């Protein structure tokens, strides 16, 4: 056991985690050169295309160190995006140490900080690594000082490497073997294994990634899930060397995969403890804290026949993604679907794309909203995650919106732009600290403004240099109203949005204008209105298409023309009564872009 090292790699987006993982795998001979490809661990097509890591992946490698010993390295590559930070905290729970990778050109960024604090809270040994030293812009001395200044760990002798060229990667491994402690645990005690991650395989059922904390797990053992008390047979187990390799046992301190032929998706939840049925452990390991979704959106299948397969797909996906929340919902405009909760907009996009790709579904998404806390006049408190669930205005005593605490790190040059942006987003500054050339800003900004497009706008006002990390702080009373959209005097529930009263007029007007461009012209006039309660705040009309009925009259009599026009008018009137308007998917997404283009 003293030769096992469990660690994960944490860093900000694009600081080179996945590339470093590739080099480590290559040096330790996990894959032959022929099988080696860029970003081996980003196994989803989606991860490759966007160049980001979404799921944490684990690998077991053997490394022969300079002291002659062979060490078993179990390492986990983690995502860097703030939307996937729960993936990071789960991976860290399975480790004794973490490599903090910092780009020697960019320096410390907000996510570096957030992930590093998560690791320190879990009492992990953090080993700083300066990556990308082959870049002409690299300044390792400055960045080492920055790490000490901002993060507060000693980085004077931080390992310097370039994952792209492979320089210094062996030093990283040597340092890691030296500094990260071996796992603690009792190899002879009763079995306790923590489920770090699970996914669904069509042939094997549920596959779980486990970290053995105490005891040993052998193939063929009877295994008990501690939260449900159900027992299963350990049919197959093994490790990833990125390839799936079968083993006969997993020893104390190791990380590996396990197949127990669990067909029920909820059979082995992530964060649960597995123990042996014969000699069970007394208590479960501390799991993970549940993450609360920050953004909710309705997902509906385009054709209602897909509802069943959509439900199964969501079930399988939520096994793999512990933070996805969903409950059935129906909408008068879109039929049956699900209300899903996500950690952020990127998370929502990824889930939607995964559902469409991996499970072949066609989906319509409604605009995302955050959760509001409503105190009714009867002094009840309810939580509303969809505009259609908002009680009537005269029943609301107070409406409170969620406030996010945003930590931003940015170069001084862009401070003015960023502060202007935060004020425009109704932000309140709570702190500002200068670290050398960097400024650490803390603002309290309404969550609704943060999840909408704050990140994109922050990046564009600071030319990509600012970085953001946010978390939910509290609910705060605010003057929010619901803007409804009426099409031909009928409310479309999927188009409603909740916004601040000061912005309501503008948002309503913009939304109506956007709708006008997006709804195709019909044979009759379509009236689009935005309303707060019964008060109409904006209106616009999509003009009808009409045939020129007079084309066949040469010069003819005026009464003849009048008769034809009158006939056409009556036809249109009849059509308008029975006609219904098909809304394209773009119309539902238009709400997202309200407030973006006029800045």
Curated annotation (Swiss-Prot):
It is found in: Cell inner membrane. SUPFAM superfamilies: EF-G C-terminal domain-like, P-loop containing nucleoside triphosphate hydrolases. GO terms for molecular function: GTP binding; GTPase activity; guanosine tetraphosphate binding; ribosome binding; translation elongation factor activity. GTP binds at residues 14-19, 131-134. Its main location: membrane. It is a peripheral membrane protein. It is an enzyme of class 3 (hydrolase). Keywords: Cell inner membrane, Cell membrane, GTP-binding, Hydrolase, Membrane, Nucleotide-binding, Protein biosynthesis. One of its GO terms (cellular component) is plasma membrane. Disulfide bonds: none annotated. Gene3D superfamilies: 3.30.70.240, Elongation factor 4, C-terminal domain (3.30.70.2570), Elongation Factor G (Translational Gtpase), domain 3 (3.30.70.870), P-loop containing nucleotide triphosphate hydrolases (3.40.50.300), Translation factors (2.40.30.10). Residues 2-184 form the tr-type G domain. Pfam families: EFG_C, GTP_EFTU, GTP_EFTU_D2, LepA_C. It catalyses: GTP + H2O = GDP + phosphate + H(+). It comes from the Bacteria. Its EC number is 3.6.5.n1. GO terms for biological process: positive regulation of translation. Belongs to the TRAFAC class translation factor GTPase superfamily. Classic translation factor GTPase family. LepA subfamily. HAMAP family: LepA. Required for accurate and efficient protein synthesis under certain stress conditions. May act as a fidelity factor of the translation reaction, by catalyzing a one-codon backward translocation of tRNAs on improperly translocated ribosomes. Back-translocation proceeds from a post-translocation (POST) complex to a pre-translocation (PRE) complex, thus giving elongation factor G a second chance to translocate the tRNAs correctly. Binds to ribosomes in a GTP-dependent manner. This is Elongation factor 4. It comes from Salmonella arizonae (strain ATCC BAA-731 / CDC346-86 / RSK2980). The lineage of its organism: Bacteria, Pseudomonadati, Pseudomonadota, Gammaproteobacteria, Enterobacterales.
């Amino acid at each position: 056991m003293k030769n096992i090292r469990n660690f994960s790699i944490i860093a900000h987006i694009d600081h080179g985690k996945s590339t470093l993982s590739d080099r480590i795998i290559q040096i330790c001979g996990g894959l032959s050169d022929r099988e080696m490809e860029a970003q081996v661990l980003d196994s989803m097509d989606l991860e490759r295309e966007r160049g980001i890591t979404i799921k944490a992946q684990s690998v077991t490698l053997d490394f022969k160190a300079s002291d002659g010993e062979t060490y078993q390295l179990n390492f986990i590559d983690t995502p860097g995006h703030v939307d996937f930070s729960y993936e990071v905290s789960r991976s860290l729970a399975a480790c004794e140490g973490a490599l903090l990778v910092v780009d020697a050109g960019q320096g410390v960024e907000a996510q570096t900080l957030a992930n590093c604090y998560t690791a320190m809270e879990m009492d992990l040994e953090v080993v700083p690594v300066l990556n990308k030293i082959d870049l002409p812009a690299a300044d390792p001395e400055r960045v080492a000082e920055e790490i000490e200044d901002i993060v507060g760990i000693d980085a004077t002798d931080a390992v310097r490497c370039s994952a792209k060229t492979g320089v210094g990667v062996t030093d990283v491994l040597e340092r890691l073997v030296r500094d990260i402690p071996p796992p603690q645990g009792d190899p002879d005690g009763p079995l306790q294994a923590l489920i770090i991650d699970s996914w669904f395989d069509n042939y094997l059922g549920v596959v779980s990634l486990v970290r053995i904390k105490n005891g040993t797990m052998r193939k063929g053992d009877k295994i008990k899930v501690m939260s449900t008390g159900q027992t299963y047979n350990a049919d197959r187990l093994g490790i990833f060397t990125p390839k799936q390799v079968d083993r006969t046992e997993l020893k104390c301190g190791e990380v590996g995969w396990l197949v127990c032929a669990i067909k029920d998706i909820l059979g082995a939840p992530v964060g649960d403890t597995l123990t042996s049925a014969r000699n069970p452990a007394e208590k479960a390991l501390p799991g993970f804290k549940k993450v609360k979704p920050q953004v909710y959106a309705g997902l509906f299948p385009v054709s209602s026949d897909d509802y069943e397969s959509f439900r199964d797909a969501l079930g399988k996906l939520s096994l793999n993604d512990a933070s996805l929340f969903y409950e059935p919902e129906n909408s008068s405009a879109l039929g049956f679907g699900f209300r899903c909760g996500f950690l952020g907009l990127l998370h929502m996009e990824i889930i939607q794309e995964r559902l469409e790709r991996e499970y072949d579904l066609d989906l319509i998404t409604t605009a995302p909203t955050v959760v509001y806390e409503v105190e009714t006049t009867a002094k009840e408190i309810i939580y509303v995650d969809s505009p259609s669930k908002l009680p009537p205005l005269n029943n609301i005593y107070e409406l409170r919106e969620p406030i996010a605490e945003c930590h931003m790190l940015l170069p001084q040059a862009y401070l003015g732009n960023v502060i202007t942006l935060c004020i425009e987003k109704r932000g309140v500054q709570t702190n500002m600290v200068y670290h050398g050339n960097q400024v650490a800003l803390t603002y309290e900004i309404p969550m609704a403004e943060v999840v909408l497009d704050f990140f994109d706008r922050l990046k564009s006002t600071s030319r990509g240099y600012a970085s953001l990390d946010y978390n939910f702080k509290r609910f705060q009373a605010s003057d929010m109203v619901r803007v409804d959209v009426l099409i031909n005097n009928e409310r479309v529930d999927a188009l409603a949005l909740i916004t601040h009263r000061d912005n309501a007029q503008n948002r309503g007007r913009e939304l109506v204008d956007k709708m006008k461009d997006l709804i195709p012209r019909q044979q009759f006039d379509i009236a689009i209105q935005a309303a707060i309660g019964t008060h109409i705040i904006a209106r616009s009309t999509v003009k009808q298409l009409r045939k020129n009925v007079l084309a066949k009259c040469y010069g003819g009599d005026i009464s003849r023309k009048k008769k034809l026009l009158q006939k056409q008018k009556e036809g249109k009137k009849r059509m308008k009564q029975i006609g219904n308007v098909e809304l394209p998917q773009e119309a539902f997404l238009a709400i997202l872009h309200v407030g973006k283009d006029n800045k």
